[in-house]
From Swiss-Prot:
Record-linked HAMAP family: MurA
Enzyme class: transferase
Highest taxon of the lineage: Bacteria
Entry-linked CDD domains: UdpNAET
Record Pfam families: EPSP_synthase (PF00275)
Subcellular location per the Swiss-Prot or TrEMBL entry: Cytoplasm
Record-given protein name: UDP-N-acetylglucosamine 1-carboxyvinyltransferase
Residues where UDP-N-acetyl-alpha-D-glucosamine binds: 93, 122-126, 308, 330
Main location: cytoplasm
Active site residues per record: 117
Involved pathway(s): Cell wall biogenesis; peptidoglycan biosynthesis
GO cellular component, one term: cytoplasm
């Protein structure tokens, strides 16, 4: 297993390009199955989960064509099997996203139940109930969800989500795109990635209205046609590099991004004392060498502060002036990185879903271990400001969500290198 070695103390300075958003790319790739012709998806991040999704298509008999710009062409007409096998699904929970499109387009699907994700329980019952509301017959047996559309195909339905679910909203929205009649999804997720998926469905000739609000209306169409689409930028990667600049007292400009999808995070960075300037597709943060001020925050569904930025702000608070409380309302078990940060000298108390962080003047380099994707990013940020060397183990977690993290940080002046395990 690869490791990262980071020597702290360098003030970050420079410009980097932000990659496409994994959490938009995965549902958009799944939605290509709805089309009746070839579809091209561009700005895909070069990440393991994306490769797994493309491999899953290969298993189904679809041969994706990848060009030199990392755009992928998928022709779902060549599909031979409607099964998403366990050995692929277990490595990537987002494989559940092929369930809705396959049932809608081909009338049946067999998708392995995803295994446990490191962050608490993420049930798939909303996906199942949503499809049942549209007339699908579903059995769960032998660790597989087996779904069949009724005679004549799925029917539009009104469906209320008991809890806000991003992948649940996406799965049912994709299924509804080809269902007969109108579907109304209430208490739907409002995330920008949901909006990106709706825009993609509409680019193929679909009729999705209201994405970005909590009520999405989908009028099913007979067919969806070929299209070419570019995935939105990654707001979490954007936020992570801005926090990296803030903790090191540096100046970083992130390009090919969108400031409007990150407002809650930018607000907190201003509160921490950062100077921010934005353009249509760029954000520049300058700390002028100052130490950040601690901030209080509470995670909640979009447009509030994103849970995927919580760990990074714990790193910021760990070296900030003052004390900040971080309240996690989305996932359980989301403070696993705190115990690794203790090894670096951080002062953090966890009480239930709250972490109280008292800033210290400096952290100390230490061997630490990544436990999940965003937690691992917080360890990288802490290592950038720690005295001496930090060795981060199990960085495959980082590689799941950050494209070329060491190259991008090196471009900003960080002392970081990857060593093979």
């Amino acid at each position: 297993m690869d490791k990262l070695i980071i020597t702290g103390g360098a003030r970050l300075d420079g410009e980097i390009r932000i990659s496409g958003a994994k959490n938009a790319a995965l549902p958009i790739l799944a939605a290509t199955l709805l089309a009746d012709g070839p579809v091209t998806v561009g700005n895909l991040p070069h990440l393991h989960d994306i490769t797994t999704m493309i491999e899953l298509f290969g298993r189904m008999g679809i041969e994706p064509v990848i060009d030199e710009k990392l755009a992928v062409e998928i022709d779902p007409r060549t599909i031979k099997t409607l099964v998403a096998p366990y050995e692929l699904v277990k490595t990537m929970r987002a494989s559940i996203l092929v369930l809705g499109p396959m049932v809608a387009r081909f009338g049946e699907a067999e998708v392995a139940l995803p295994g446990g994700c490191a962050i608490g329980s993420r049930p798939v019952d909303l996906h199942i109930r949503g499809l049942e509301a549209m007339g699908a017959k579903i059995e769960v047996e032998g660790g597989y969800i087996k779904a069949k559309a009724p005679e004549g195909g799925l029917r539009g339905a009104h469906f209320f989500f008991d809890t806000v679910s991003v992948t649940g909203t996406e799965n049912i929205m994709m299924a509804a795109a080809l269902a007969k009649g109108r579907s109304v999804l209430q208490n739907a997720a409002r995330e920008p990635e949901v909006v990106d998926l709706a825009n993609f469905i509409n680019a193929m000739g679909g009729n999705v209205q209201g994405a970005g609000t909590d009520t999405i209306t989908i009028d099913g169409v007979e067919r969806l046609h070929s299209a070419s689409y570019r995935v939105m930028p990654d707001r979490i990667e954007t936020g992570t590099y801005l926090v990296a600049a803030a903790v090191t007292g540096g100046r970083v400009k992130v390009k090919d991004t969108d400031p409007t999808i990150l407002e809650a995070v930018l607000e907190k960075l201003k509160e921490a004392g950062a100077d921010l300037t934005t353009g249509e597709d760029w954000i520049e943060l300058n700390m002028h060498g100052k130490r950040p001020k601690a901030v209080n925050l509470r995670t909640a569904p979009y447009p509030a502060f994103p849970t995927d930025m919580q760990a990074q702000f714990i790193s910021l608070n760990a070296i900030a002036e003052g004390t900040g409380a971080v309240i996690e309302t989305i996932f359980e078990n989301r403070f696993m990185h705190v115990y690794e940060m203790h090894r670096m000298g951080a002062h953090i108390q966890v009480e239930g879903n709250t972490a109280i962080v008292t800033g210290v003047p400096a952290l100390k380099g230490a061997p630490v271990m990544a436990t999940d994707l965003r937690a691992s990013a917080s360890l990288v940020l802490s290592a950038l400001v720690a005295e001496g060397d930090t060795l981060i183990d199990r960085i495959y977690h980082i590689d799941r969500g950050y494209e070329c993290i060491e190259e991008k940080l090196q471009m900003l002046g960080a002392k970081i290198r990857r060593v093979p395990g």
